[in-house]
Amino acid sequence: MALPDFNIRQLLEAGVHFGHQTQRWNPRMAPYIYGDRNGIHIMDLTQTVPMLDQALQAVRDTVAKGGRVLFVGTKRQAQKPIAEAAERCAQYYMNHRWLGGTLTNWKTVSNSIGRLKSIDEAMEGGFEGLTKKERLGMERDQGKLQASLGGIREMGGVPDLIFVIDVKKEDLAIAEANKLGIPVVAVVDTNCSPDGVDYVIPGNDDAARAIALYCDLVARAALDGMSAQLGAAGVDLGALEEGGVEEALAEEAAAPAES
Protein backbone atom coordinates (compact mmCIF):
# COMPACT_ATOMS: atom_id res chain seq x y z
CA MET A 1 0.00 0.00 0.00
CA ALA A 2 1.03 3.62 -0.43
CA LEU A 3 -0.15 7.11 0.42
CA PRO A 4 -3.28 7.71 -1.71
CA ASP A 5 -2.81 9.48 -5.03
CA PHE A 6 -5.10 12.28 -6.12
CA ASN A 7 -4.95 15.13 -8.62
CA ILE A 8 -6.42 18.55 -9.36
CA ARG A 9 -8.95 17.03 -11.76
CA GLN A 10 -10.45 14.91 -8.97
CA LEU A 11 -10.65 17.96 -6.70
CA LEU A 12 -12.35 19.98 -9.45
CA GLU A 13 -14.88 17.21 -10.15
CA ALA A 14 -15.72 17.05 -6.43
CA GLY A 15 -16.19 20.82 -6.24
CA VAL A 16 -13.37 21.32 -3.73
CA HIS A 17 -12.53 24.69 -5.34
CA PHE A 18 -15.90 26.32 -4.66
CA GLY A 19 -15.83 28.57 -1.59
CA HIS A 20 -18.60 30.74 -0.16
CA GLN A 21 -20.10 34.03 -1.32
CA THR A 22 -17.45 36.74 -1.41
CA GLN A 23 -19.20 38.85 1.24
CA ARG A 24 -19.03 35.94 3.70
CA TRP A 25 -15.29 35.44 3.41
CA ASN A 26 -12.75 35.36 6.23
CA PRO A 27 -9.70 37.50 5.30
CA ARG A 28 -7.44 34.93 7.01
CA MET A 29 -8.15 32.64 4.03
CA ALA A 30 -7.01 35.24 1.47
CA PRO A 31 -3.68 33.45 0.74
CA TYR A 32 -5.57 30.36 -0.43
CA ILE A 33 -8.11 32.10 -2.70
CA TYR A 34 -7.49 32.18 -6.47
CA GLY A 35 -10.24 34.67 -7.28
CA ASP A 36 -14.01 34.85 -7.56
CA ARG A 37 -16.64 33.85 -10.08
CA ASN A 38 -20.24 35.11 -10.02
CA GLY A 39 -19.82 36.31 -6.44
CA ILE A 40 -18.33 33.00 -5.21
CA HIS A 41 -14.73 32.68 -4.04
CA ILE A 42 -12.64 30.07 -5.85
CA MET A 43 -9.88 28.19 -4.02
CA ASP A 44 -6.36 28.03 -5.41
CA LEU A 45 -6.10 24.27 -5.93
CA THR A 46 -2.38 24.52 -6.72
CA GLN A 47 -2.06 25.21 -2.98
CA THR A 48 -4.72 22.75 -1.84
CA VAL A 49 -2.96 19.80 -3.52
CA PRO A 50 0.36 19.99 -1.60
CA MET A 51 -1.40 20.97 1.65
CA LEU A 52 -3.78 18.02 1.37
CA ASP A 53 -0.79 15.79 0.69
CA GLN A 54 0.93 17.06 3.87
CA ALA A 55 -2.26 16.42 5.85
CA LEU A 56 -2.50 12.85 4.55
CA GLN A 57 1.16 12.29 5.42
CA ALA A 58 0.45 13.46 8.99
CA VAL A 59 -2.44 10.99 9.28
CA ARG A 60 -0.34 8.18 7.86
CA ASP A 61 2.61 8.90 10.17
CA THR A 62 0.35 9.11 13.24
CA VAL A 63 -1.17 5.69 12.59
CA ALA A 64 2.21 4.20 11.63
CA LYS A 65 3.44 5.07 15.14
CA GLY A 66 0.44 3.32 16.69
CA GLY A 67 -1.50 6.56 17.21
CA ARG A 68 -5.27 7.03 17.19
CA VAL A 69 -7.10 9.32 14.76
CA LEU A 70 -10.48 10.84 15.63
CA PHE A 71 -12.70 11.82 12.67
CA VAL A 72 -15.00 14.74 13.54
CA GLY A 73 -17.94 15.88 11.40
CA THR A 74 -21.37 16.50 12.89
CA LYS A 75 -23.07 18.43 10.06
CA ARG A 76 -25.77 16.46 8.28
CA GLN A 77 -23.89 15.76 5.03
CA ALA A 78 -20.71 14.72 6.88
CA GLN A 79 -22.23 12.29 9.39
CA LYS A 80 -22.35 9.18 7.20
CA PRO A 81 -19.03 9.56 5.32
CA ILE A 82 -17.20 10.42 8.57
CA ALA A 83 -18.48 7.27 10.30
CA GLU A 84 -17.90 5.00 7.29
CA ALA A 85 -14.36 6.29 6.71
CA ALA A 86 -13.36 5.90 10.36
CA GLU A 87 -14.79 2.38 10.58
CA ARG A 88 -13.10 1.40 7.32
CA CYS A 89 -9.65 2.16 8.74
CA ALA A 90 -10.32 1.01 12.34
CA GLN A 91 -10.22 4.54 13.75
CA TYR A 92 -12.75 6.58 15.73
CA TYR A 93 -15.39 9.23 15.08
CA MET A 94 -17.79 11.81 16.49
CA ASN A 95 -20.61 12.49 14.03
CA HIS A 96 -23.65 13.26 16.17
CA ARG A 97 -22.87 16.21 18.41
CA TRP A 98 -19.60 17.26 19.99
CA LEU A 99 -19.88 16.79 23.74
CA GLY A 100 -17.99 19.51 25.61
CA GLY A 101 -15.05 17.94 27.45
CA THR A 102 -14.76 14.93 25.14
CA LEU A 103 -10.99 15.50 25.06
CA THR A 104 -10.34 17.79 28.04
CA ASN A 105 -12.48 15.77 30.45
CA TRP A 106 -11.87 12.27 29.14
CA LYS A 107 -12.42 10.66 32.57
CA THR A 108 -16.08 11.72 32.61
CA VAL A 109 -16.56 10.66 28.98
CA SER A 110 -14.92 7.34 29.80
CA ASN A 111 -17.44 6.81 32.60
CA SER A 112 -20.29 7.41 30.14
CA ILE A 113 -18.73 4.88 27.75
CA GLY A 114 -18.62 2.42 30.65
CA ARG A 115 -22.33 3.04 31.24
CA LEU A 116 -23.03 2.37 27.53
CA LYS A 117 -21.12 -0.91 27.67
CA SER A 118 -22.92 -2.03 30.84
CA ILE A 119 -26.32 -1.31 29.24
CA ASP A 120 -25.28 -3.30 26.16
CA GLU A 121 -24.34 -6.23 28.40
CA ALA A 122 -27.71 -6.00 30.16
CA MET A 123 -29.48 -5.97 26.78
CA GLU A 124 -27.55 -9.05 25.67
CA GLY A 125 -28.71 -10.76 28.85
CA GLY A 126 -32.32 -9.90 28.05
CA PHE A 127 -32.58 -7.32 30.87
CA GLU A 128 -32.96 -10.16 33.35
CA GLY A 129 -34.57 -9.12 36.63
CA LEU A 130 -35.57 -5.64 35.41
CA THR A 131 -39.06 -4.17 35.19
CA LYS A 132 -40.54 -3.00 31.90
CA LYS A 133 -40.09 0.63 32.99
CA GLU A 134 -36.41 0.02 33.84
CA ARG A 135 -35.89 -1.70 30.49
CA LEU A 136 -37.43 1.18 28.55
CA GLY A 137 -35.32 3.68 30.46
CA MET A 138 -32.13 1.76 29.71
CA GLU A 139 -33.04 1.38 26.04
CA ARG A 140 -33.60 5.14 25.81
CA ASP A 141 -30.26 5.81 27.51
CA GLN A 142 -28.55 3.32 25.21
CA GLY A 143 -29.86 5.11 22.12
CA LYS A 144 -28.62 8.50 23.31
CA LEU A 145 -25.23 7.20 24.46
CA GLN A 146 -24.69 5.16 21.29
CA ALA A 147 -25.43 8.19 19.08
CA SER A 148 -23.03 10.39 21.04
CA LEU A 149 -20.28 7.95 21.99
CA GLY A 150 -20.61 4.89 19.75
CA GLY A 151 -17.77 6.05 17.50
CA ILE A 152 -15.30 6.45 20.39
CA ARG A 153 -16.37 3.63 22.71
CA GLU A 154 -13.22 1.61 21.94
CA MET A 155 -10.81 4.56 21.69
CA GLY A 156 -9.38 3.96 25.16
CA GLY A 157 -8.00 7.48 25.64
CA VAL A 158 -7.62 10.82 23.90
CA PRO A 159 -6.62 10.63 20.22
CA ASP A 160 -3.21 11.50 18.82
CA LEU A 161 -4.66 13.53 15.92
CA ILE A 162 -8.10 14.80 14.92
CA PHE A 163 -9.47 15.21 11.39
CA VAL A 164 -12.23 17.81 11.10
CA ILE A 165 -14.83 18.74 8.48
CA ASP A 166 -16.07 22.35 9.03
CA VAL A 167 -13.88 24.21 11.54
CA LYS A 168 -16.63 26.74 12.30
CA LYS A 169 -19.12 24.09 13.39
CA GLU A 170 -16.49 22.03 15.21
CA ASP A 171 -14.78 24.94 16.98
CA LEU A 172 -15.16 23.27 20.39
CA ALA A 173 -13.37 20.13 19.21
CA ILE A 174 -10.50 22.20 17.81
CA ALA A 175 -10.24 24.31 20.97
CA GLU A 176 -10.00 21.17 23.13
CA ALA A 177 -7.39 19.62 20.83
CA ASN A 178 -5.36 22.86 20.91
CA LYS A 179 -5.51 22.91 24.71
CA LEU A 180 -4.08 19.38 24.89
CA GLY A 181 -1.56 19.85 22.07
CA ILE A 182 -3.29 17.32 19.81
CA PRO A 183 -2.53 18.06 16.12
CA VAL A 184 -5.52 19.14 14.02
CA VAL A 185 -6.04 18.27 10.34
CA ALA A 186 -9.02 20.18 8.96
CA VAL A 187 -10.83 21.23 5.81
CA VAL A 188 -11.07 25.04 5.95
CA ASP A 189 -13.55 26.88 3.70
CA THR A 190 -13.33 30.54 2.63
CA ASN A 191 -15.71 31.67 5.39
CA CYS A 192 -13.58 30.18 8.18
CA SER A 193 -10.33 30.94 10.00
CA PRO A 194 -7.42 28.51 9.75
CA ASP A 195 -6.26 29.52 13.25
CA GLY A 196 -5.74 26.51 15.51
CA VAL A 197 -5.39 24.11 12.57
CA ASP A 198 -1.98 22.45 12.21
CA TYR A 199 -2.63 20.97 8.77
CA VAL A 200 -4.96 23.21 6.76
CA ILE A 201 -6.78 21.75 3.74
CA PRO A 202 -8.23 24.77 1.89
CA GLY A 203 -11.46 23.52 0.35
CA ASN A 204 -15.23 23.31 0.18
CA ASP A 205 -16.63 21.86 3.42
CA ASP A 206 -20.28 21.65 2.30
CA ALA A 207 -20.47 19.66 -0.96
CA ALA A 208 -21.23 15.98 -0.40
CA ARG A 209 -18.79 14.86 -3.12
CA ALA A 210 -15.97 16.95 -1.65
CA ILE A 211 -16.59 15.59 1.86
CA ALA A 212 -16.68 12.03 0.51
CA LEU A 213 -13.34 12.60 -1.25
CA TYR A 214 -11.60 13.99 1.86
CA CYS A 215 -12.90 11.12 4.01
CA ASP A 216 -11.85 8.51 1.46
CA LEU A 217 -8.32 9.93 1.19
CA VAL A 218 -7.86 10.22 4.96
CA ALA A 219 -9.12 6.65 5.49
CA ARG A 220 -6.69 5.37 2.85
CA ALA A 221 -3.81 7.31 4.44
CA ALA A 222 -4.66 5.74 7.81
CA LEU A 223 -4.73 2.28 6.22
CA ASP A 224 -1.31 2.93 4.73
CA GLY A 225 -0.06 3.89 8.19
CA MET A 226 -1.50 0.70 9.62
CA SER A 227 0.22 -1.28 6.87
CA ALA A 228 3.54 0.31 7.84
CA GLN A 229 2.92 -0.37 11.53
CA LEU A 230 1.91 -4.02 11.24
CA GLY A 231 3.65 -5.09 8.05
CA ALA A 232 6.90 -5.86 9.84
CA ALA A 233 5.03 -8.27 12.12
CA GLY A 234 4.12 -10.39 9.11
CA VAL A 235 0.41 -9.60 9.18
CA ASP A 236 -1.16 -9.82 5.72
CA LEU A 237 -2.89 -6.48 5.21
CA GLY A 238 -3.79 -7.00 1.57
CA ALA A 239 -7.47 -7.37 2.42
CA LEU A 240 -7.69 -4.32 4.70
CA GLU A 241 -9.78 -2.18 2.38
CA GLU A 242 -12.11 -5.11 1.74
CA GLY A 243 -13.08 -5.09 5.41
CA GLY A 244 -10.36 -7.22 6.98
CA VAL A 245 -9.04 -4.61 9.41
CA GLU A 246 -10.45 -6.15 12.58
CA GLU A 247 -9.46 -9.67 11.53
CA ALA A 248 -5.88 -8.58 10.83
CA LEU A 249 -5.66 -6.79 14.17
CA ALA A 250 -7.07 -9.85 15.95
CA GLU A 251 -4.46 -12.06 14.29
CA GLU A 252 -1.73 -9.67 15.39
CA ALA A 253 -3.00 -9.62 18.98
CA ALA A 254 -3.27 -13.42 19.09
CA ALA A 255 0.20 -14.04 17.64
CA PRO A 256 2.69 -15.23 20.31
CA ALA A 257 5.47 -12.76 21.08
CA GLU A 258 8.85 -13.67 19.63
CA SER A 259 11.49 -14.54 22.21
Swiss-Prot record:
Keywords: Ribonucleoprotein, Ribosomal protein. One of its GO terms (cellular component) is cytosolic small ribosomal subunit. GO terms for biological process: translation. PROSITE patterns: RIBOSOMAL_S2_1, RIBOSOMAL_S2_2. This is Small ribosomal subunit protein uS2. It holds the Pfam family Ribosomal_S2. GO terms for molecular function: structural constituent of ribosome. It comes from the Bacteria. The gene is rpsB. Disulfide bonds: none annotated. It comes from Dinoroseobacter shibae (strain DSM 16493 / NCIMB 14021 / DFL 12). Belongs to the universal ribosomal protein uS2 family.
